[in-house]
Amino acid sequence: MKYKSNIKVSIIVAIYNSDKFLEKLILSIIGQTYKNIEVILVDDGSPDNSGAICDKYAVIDSRIKVLHKPNGGCCDARNKGLELVTGEFLTIIDGDDWLEPDYIEYLLRVVLQTDSDMAMSLNIFTTRERIQVKFDKIETWTSEDAAIAI
């Protein structure tokens, strides 16, 4: 995807009490095969060590921005993150998720190849006992399709 590397993808992560999962998530983001990303970590008033973990990685990787805010809920955290976005495309990740190494590259390629404005990826939910696949394909939409669906 080097020919499209000028397209910046913004990643918003809403974080609340996610310190057990956060390093795995951040490492999966900064290890993406597609490098032109900005990462907006929104610490939603976590009383655990989440904020400190975010700050640690912001020092390590200049693509990471951290916003600390009082707890207002997931939607509020995402909305505050949206105020900082500078990318052409956006993905929103939860603080207890992680990404496959080619997540951004693959979805960006699908969007560009299909002339879509939005893509939804495969979601895999795991517990200690099992792995459950919720969606088994990539779905894409134009802006008009998405507006109609809402």
Task: Label the predicted regions.
Residues 1-150:
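Nucleotide-sugar donor-binding/catalytic module of glycosyltransferases
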